[in-house]
């Protein structure tokens, strides 16, 4: 055989190892000579096709195992398939039939009926290559021939079969008669059921019992139709493959929906699962009583359903049409133990992508079982603490707050048994052991080899096999290459060890991962009665990690390859030892050169310094807060692990844990904890030493450790029991309580599938994918006692019940979140806010304030100062003031504009007083507080009667209550819209005000969304070669959603910690999304959890202030001087007249394209219907467009039916309170009605009666009942104010408007169309519009930009090409009646490159395209684009050198 052929065979064996089939010896005759002939990779479609040359066609079972294994192994890389090429293509009927189910199974996904037909029969085989199947009729035959025959033949071909032909024959008469009888029986039964239903309905009508939709509530178990007998056969949903005429199923309802049909009947649709699969159940109401009964069917009920299974063309899946539905008792797990345990190791969905059951469901289960306490121990995080605390209160449970931490030792030693030996002069015994496993206690050495090295030269060798006294496992043979024949008859361990000890003498021992090799050597020495080795030891693994921390990994084969050291056969001791020797000498020399290390006892001098924490291997430990001090220390440790010691995962150095141990209890955690590992690998003595550090010892049920047995880290269940018994003995010897914990990741055994899907979604990156996931559901006391029965009844009860409650009793009752609001304190804030407010009021309204002004100020200041909110106003004032001084307007959001104090302290421009005139000269004022005017901006122009100065017009008529509540005690939520350009400056300014240690970005937690979960489920279905029904997909998706995926930060939220406390009083701290290079740290808790405890400033970035600033810079016009009632501007909202174009020119009947809040198609349609002419009407429209069920099906109908006009409808939440007060309702009731309506809760009878009594129109009352959400008027007014200012420029300074729009708001351009004029733009718009829903997001964004470009062109302006010497990096420039686009408008040219071009041209003209590419850092693709667009005319391709 050639070397190339051998390589192909080796590749096949490597493939078998990669897919986990290296130990499958049953099929050795088929695989031993198999080769990978070629691999065809399609990068575009991400598919790999393996062409395998084999002696003969594989058995079907082997083909299936390989197919599944490959799909699983390469799921994150590509879709895989095999093309088998056998030397011998002999086939027979048995082989054809063996493969049949594999071949036709995929057909079931496309046609369940045909799939079932094919699956339920065996094809016959006719020579030479014909297969024959049976069908019922011509339709089935045609369907198979047209849709599936070619695929069946193709699939056989891929499995290595010769080209087959396929025939079909009709079932014989007896078979056909049987089929017809089935269909006839079904038809008769359906007719019988229909007749029975008619009789029942007639009987009800005769007895006058035809119920109404308001039927009496359910008093017993739910039942529609007939009673289903207890002994009726139940079919598993997982066994329903095709249409069935009459079956009974049962399951849990997990979704319900009732739809009212045009016919007046109701359609009940719900989904049930019995955890083998799920199904949609449908039922039509027969009368009003059925319709009323439908309302009683709830999610969470268990039901038994009888009916027929049909193929539903609408959902394209099998569904059941129910005839009878009976509620039944659900399946519940009970805890019948007299004394209950407490679970101390439990994960919530905050354990990232690893746990699925909600905190509420887990805590409810504990309470239902009668447990008194429960712990939370998520991986490294405390993010479930707030929810856990609430659930504990809800269910009466004591909550133990903890984490499962990644603990590390402070630097791992490079050297052991330190001795003052000169490294360059020493003799080294470099050795390696090959073993039967990883445990020095339970496994044995089978090969021991070493070399002696002096001055970099090998001077002696030692090599010996050791007979273990038993056959080697397949894993050992495959990993080491050592076979039974090689070790059989070799010297026993005691002989070899004595020889090795004598050979090694007192020389320095060296090994790669010395802790492993020395662990085996020393344990073996002790077993044969020898002392542990006292030699100086060097670990080349840790030395390499220290010297080269930037290497991706430090495995022996990686390092030898890096340094060109020969490693002939990795995992054979003799070859590993020799390679390690040359590596060690290289490392010793580098240690001297890089760190001046010359002696053995200096090797550990740098241990624990710098990035040493990155080199340490983390192990798990559970850390619990015992006291309030401990809770704060836990928060500090979590912060430290995320900020100072994050590397792949948050890490806690043992030294830091020791420093902050006060108030903490520490447990040994799971199989990844150091105590279990010590017992498994090093034995009792090592485990006892480890146990000294901990407060209690954890053991878990045997199934939790199952992956260790599967991966052969533990030999078998008996060996596992021995380890657990020994751990219990360690507890007895050390006096540490041993507690049985569950390592809970989900509530019930049936929930395991959700975790499997989540873990599978992470592919090879998650080590849990290396073995079958263990059973880690929440176990009852009974279940746990049964799991530990092997310890004896008494000991089992001690560790399950007694000790778990003992640990609970150690813990104080703790509250991880505060009850009160803690705002920062600024000395004199109250006086400053009061003085500012009155100062500005006097400046505007005169020395003697109008009564309405003074009353409003006093009312607000009393609430603001009385409840400690003055500091919040002062901080907001400082932020806004700085922005204004720096030249950027600030827009207010939310309801802050409802506060007159906010207006007077310049936090908002919105004035909430009733509409009024105000003289800027003599301070005279005139108020309209009767509701006759909607906005002061709508008042007609008027001169002051006292001094003749034109009046200013102000006031939006907004009650203060909508901001701070009726009692004025609601925490103010001041949202401010800063320019997007200025936002980082505003954020940084908060650090100046409060100090860096007291401000943090508001943290957020990103969880698995429904769409993402759907992808996970479908990928799992594909990779596991499954067919999952649609309803089952929905269930699995629901089970995977809500699990933490990542963390982030609120776009503008800044959390302020008062300086008389520190952040750990409220929350740990971390970086967003674990980005350790982030400029800001965030709160570890989601900001909603601490929203009511600390001040949150909403410093948001917005385009409007940026646009206003650019317009001001271009025009020199102060935006505050722009009139709010300009007639031409107001016309813009109802026609295109002000633009000088016709509606057909711009495909819009209004001129609001590009105007914030009014440019979308939806709002433009509202404008067309309502034809607003005033500012207050624009505020109405802003409110209507942002609310839910405020416009559609509500105000829209009222206006269309002429019930009322635009000013009269309910637009914003504040309108309700103001209108009702004007109608005569008491203000507190008016406020309650407003709050109820805006939250979608409708009206109570009391509210409705009061409204009717005060002559509130009935249409108004009905409108209130429909509303789900409402916009605050202050928010709407602030938005409209900005919109009107921008609209002013669109009408009167159009090129300023367009230059600003394209610079600030647009991201996607089609410069080719824009430069080529109106027809080109319209053609591109048509292309996008013709795509309809298929248009991409980028194309839809481009369409919006092109609409504005088309309008600009229609108004007589045009676009120039990008100009190499005129264009800006990132702003459109006005040039006469045209705009010059910036460089970053070129596709794929980023702003950084654009700035580079501008910087380069300032250093001189470009000599050539080559010069532009080099100096401007521009890609060839961009150069080509610019050349095609004519931007580089006259520029040669390359620099030219003239010699004369």
UniProtKB/Swiss-Prot annotation:
Pfam families noted in UniProt: DNA_pol3_a_NI, DNA_pol3_a_NII, DNA_pol3_alpha, DNA_pol3_finger, HHH_6, PHP, RNase_T, tRNA_anti-codon
Major subcellular site: cytoplasm
Disulfides per UniProt: none
Gene3D superfamilies found in the cross-reference section: 1.10.150.870, 3.30.1900.20, 6.10.140.1510, Metal-dependent hydrolases, Nucleic acid-binding proteins, PolC, middle finger domain, Ribonuclease H-like superfamily/Ribonuclease H
InterPro entries in UniProt: DNA_pol3_alpha_NTPase_dom (IPR011708), DNA_pol3_finger (IPR040982), DNA_PolC-like_N_II (IPR024754), DNA_PolC-type_N_I (IPR028112), DnaE2/DnaE/PolC (IPR004805), DNAPol_HHH (IPR029460), DnaQ (IPR006054), Exonuclease_RNaseT/DNA_pol3 (IPR013520)
Example of a GO MF term: DNA binding
Its biological purpose: Required for replicative DNA synthesis. This DNA polymerase also exhibits 3' to 5' exonuclease activity.
PANTHER family tied to this protein: DNA POLYMERASE III POLC-TYPE, DNA POLYMERASE III SUBUNIT ALPHA
NCBIfam families for the chain: dnaq, polC_Gram_pos, PRK00448.1
Protein name per Swiss-Prot or TrEMBL: DNA polymerase III PolC-type
Taxonomic source organism: Listeria innocua serovar 6a (strain ATCC BAA-680 / CLIP 11262)
């Amino acid at each position: 055989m050639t070397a190339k052929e051998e390589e192909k065979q080796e590749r096949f064996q490597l493939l078998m190892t990669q897919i986990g089939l290296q130990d499958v010896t049953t099929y050795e005759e088929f695989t031993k000579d198999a080769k990978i002939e070629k691999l065809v990779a399609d990068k575009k479609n991400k598919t790999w096709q393996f062409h395998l040359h084999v002696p003969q066609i594989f058995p079907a079972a082997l083909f299936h195992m390989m197919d599944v294994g490959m799909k699983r192994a390469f799921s994150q890389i590509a879709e895989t398939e095999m093309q088998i090429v056998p030397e011998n293509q002999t086939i027979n009927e048995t082989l054809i039939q063996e493969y049949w189910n594999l071949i036709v199974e995929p057909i079931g996904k496309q046609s369940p009926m045909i799939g079932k037909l094919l699956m339920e029969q065996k094809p016959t085989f006719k020579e030479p290559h014909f297969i024959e199947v049976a069908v019922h009729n011509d339709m089935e035959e045609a369907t198979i021939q047209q849709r599936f025959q070619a695929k069946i033949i193709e699939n056989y071909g891929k499995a290595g079969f010769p080209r087959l032909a396929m025939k079909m024959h009709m079932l014989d008469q007896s078979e056909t008669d049987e089929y017809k009888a089935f269909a006839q029986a079904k038809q008769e039964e359906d007719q019988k059921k229909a007749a029975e239903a008619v009789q029942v309905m007639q009987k009800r009508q005769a007895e006058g019992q035809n119920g109404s939709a308001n039927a009496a509530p359910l008093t017993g178990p739910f039942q529609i139709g007939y009673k289903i007998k207890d002994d009726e056969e139940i079919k598993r949903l997982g066994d329903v493959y095709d249409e069935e005429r009459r079956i009974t199923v049962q399951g849990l309802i997990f979704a319900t929906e009732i739809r009212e049909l045009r016919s007046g009947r109701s359609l009940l649709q719900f989904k049930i699962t019995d955890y083998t699969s799920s199904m949609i159940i449908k039922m039509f109401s027969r009368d009003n009583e059925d319709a009323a009964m439908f309302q009683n069917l709830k999610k969470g009920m268990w039901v038994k359903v009888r009916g027929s299974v049909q193929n539903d063309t609408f959902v394209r899946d099998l569904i059941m049409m129910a005839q009878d539905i009976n509620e039944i008792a659900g399946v519940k797990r009970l805890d019948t133990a007299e004394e209950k345990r407490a679970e101390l190791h439990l994960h919530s969905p905050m354990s990232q992508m690893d746990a699925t059951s909600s905190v509420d469901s887990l805590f409810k289960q504990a309470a239902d079982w009668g447990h008194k306490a429960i712990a939370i121990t998520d991986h490294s995080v405390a993010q479930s603490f707030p929810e856990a605390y609430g659930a504990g209160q809800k269910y009466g449970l004591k909550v133990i707050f903890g984490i499962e931490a990644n603990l590390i030792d402070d630097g791992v030693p490079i050297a052991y048994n330190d001795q003052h030996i000169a490294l360059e002069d020493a003799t080294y015994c470099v050795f390696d052991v090959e073993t039967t496993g990883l445990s020095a206690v339970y496994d044995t050495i089978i090969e021991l080899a070493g070399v002696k090295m002096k001055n970099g030269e090998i001077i002696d060798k030692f090599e010996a096999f050791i007979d273990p006294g038993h056959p080697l496992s397949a894993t050992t043979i495959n990993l080491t290459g050592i076979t039974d024949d090689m070790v059989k008859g070799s010297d026993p361990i005691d002989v070899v060890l004595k020889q090795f000890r004598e050979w090694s003498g007192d020389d320095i021992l060296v090994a790669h991962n010395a802790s492993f090799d020395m662990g085996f050597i020393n344990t073996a020495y002790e077993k044969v009665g020898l002392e542990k080795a006292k030699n100086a030891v060097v670990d080349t693994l840790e030395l390499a990690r220290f010297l080269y921390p930037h290497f991706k990994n430090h495995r022996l084969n990686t390092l030898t390859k890096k340094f060109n050291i020969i490693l002939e056969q990795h995992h054979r001791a003799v070859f590993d030892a020799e390679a390690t020797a040359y590596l060690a000498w290289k490392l010793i020399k580098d240690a001297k050169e890089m760190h001046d290390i010359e002696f053995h006892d200096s090797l550990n001098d740098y241990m624990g310094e710098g990035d040493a924490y990155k080199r340490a291997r983390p192990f798990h430990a559970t850390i619990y807060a015992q006291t309030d001090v401990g809770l704060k220390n836990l928060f500090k440790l979590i912060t430290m692990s995320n900020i100072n010691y994050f590397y792949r995962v948050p890490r806690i150095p043992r030294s830091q844990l020791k420093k902050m141990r006060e108030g903490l209890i520490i447990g040994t955690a799971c199989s990844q904890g150091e105590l279990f590992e010590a017992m498994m690998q090093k034995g009792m003595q090592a485990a006892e030493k480890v146990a000294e550090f901990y407060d209690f010892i954890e053991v878990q049920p045997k199934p939790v450790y199952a992956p260790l047995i599967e991966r052969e880290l533990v030999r078998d269940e008996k060996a596992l029991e021995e380890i657990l018994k020994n751990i219990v003995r360690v507890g007895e010897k050390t006096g540490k309580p041993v507690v049985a914990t569950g390592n809970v990741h989900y509530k019930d055994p049936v929930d395991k599938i959700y975790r499997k899907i989540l873990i599978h979604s992470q592919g090879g990156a998650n080590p849990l994918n290396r073995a079958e996931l263990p059973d880690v559901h929440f176990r009852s006391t009974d279940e746990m006692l049964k799991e530990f029965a092997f310890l004896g009844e008494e000991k089992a009860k001690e560790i399950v019940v007694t000790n778990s409650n003992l640990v609970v009793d150690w813990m104080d009752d703790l509250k991880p979140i505060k009850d009160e609001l803690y705002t920062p304190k600024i000395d004199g804030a109250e006086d400053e806010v009061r003085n500012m407010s009155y100062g500005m009021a006097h400046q505007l309204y005169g020395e003697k304030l109008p009564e309405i002004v003074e009353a409003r100020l006093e009312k607000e200041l009393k609430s603001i100062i009385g409840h400690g909110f003055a500091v919040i106003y002062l901080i907001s004032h400082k932020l806004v003031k700085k922005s204004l001084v720096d030249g950027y307007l600030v827009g207010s959001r939310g309801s802050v504009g409802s506060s007159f104090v906010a207006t007077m302290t310049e936090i908002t421009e919105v004035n909430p007083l009733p509409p009024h005139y105000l003289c800027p000269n003599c301070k005279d004022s005139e108020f309209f507080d009767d509701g006759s005017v909607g906005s002061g901006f709508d008042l007609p122009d008027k001169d002051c009667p006292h001094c003749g100065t034109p009046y200013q017009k102000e006031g939006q008529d907004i009650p203060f209550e909508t901001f701070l509540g009726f009692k004025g005690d609601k925490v103010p939520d001041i949202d401010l819209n800063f320019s997007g350009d200025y936002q980082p400056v505003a954020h940084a300014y908060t650090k100046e005000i409060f100090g860096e240690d007291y401000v943090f970005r508001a943290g957020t937690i990103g969880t698995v969304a429904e769409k993402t979960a759907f992808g996970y489920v479908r990928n799992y279905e594909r990779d596991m070669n499954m067919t999952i029904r649609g309803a089952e997909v929905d269930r699995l998706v629901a089970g995977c959603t809500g699990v933490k995926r990542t963390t982030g930060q609120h776009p503008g939220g800044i959390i302020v910690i008062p300086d008389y406390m520190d952040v750990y009083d409220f929350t740990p701290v971390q970086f967003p999304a674990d980005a350790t290079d982030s400029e800001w740290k965030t709160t570890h808790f989601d900001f909603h959890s601490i929203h009511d405890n600390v001040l949150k400033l909403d410093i948001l970035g917005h385009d409007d202030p940026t646009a206003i600033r650019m317009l001001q810079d271009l025009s020199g016009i102060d935006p505050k001087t722009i009139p709010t009632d300009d007639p031409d501007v107001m016309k813009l909202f109802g026609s295109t007249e002000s633009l000088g174009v016709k509606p057909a020119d711009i495909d819009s009947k209004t001129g609001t394209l590009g105007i914030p809040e009014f440019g979308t198609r939806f709002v433009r349609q509202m404008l067309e219907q309502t034809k607003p002419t005033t500012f207050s009407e624009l505020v109405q429209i802003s409110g209507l467009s942002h609310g839910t069920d405020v416009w559609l099906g509500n105000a829209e109908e009222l206006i269309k039916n002429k019930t009322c006009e635009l000013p009269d409808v309910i637009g914003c939440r504040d309108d309700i309170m103001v209108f009702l007060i004007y109608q005569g309702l008491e203000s507190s009731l008016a406020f309650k009605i407003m709050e109820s309506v805006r939250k979608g809760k409708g009206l109570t009878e009391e509210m409705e009666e009061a409204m009717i009594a005060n002559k509130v129109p009935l249409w108004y009352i009905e409108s209130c009942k429909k509303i789900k959400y409402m916009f605050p008027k202050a928010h709407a007014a602030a938005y409209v104010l900005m919109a009107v200012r921008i609209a002013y420029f669109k009408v009167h300074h159009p090129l300023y408007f367009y230059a600003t729009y394209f610079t600030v708001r647009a991201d996607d351009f089609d410069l080719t169309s824009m430069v080529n004029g109106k027809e080109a733009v319209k053609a591109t718009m048509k292309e996008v519009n013709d795509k309809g829903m298929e248009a991409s997001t980028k194309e839809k964004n481009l369409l919006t930009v092109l609409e504005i470009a088309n309008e600009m062109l229609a108004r007589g302006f045009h676009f120039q090409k990008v100009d190499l010497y005129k264009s800006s990096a990132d702003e459109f420039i006005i040039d006469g009646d045209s705009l010059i686009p910036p460089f970053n408008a070129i596709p794929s040219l980023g702003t950084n490159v654009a700035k580079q071009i501008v910087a380069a041209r300032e250093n001189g003209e470009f000599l050539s395209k080559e010069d532009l590419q080099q100096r401007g850092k521009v890609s060839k693709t961009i150069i080509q684009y610019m050349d095609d667009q004519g931007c580089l005319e006259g520029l040669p391709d390359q620099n030219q050198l003239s010699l004369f």
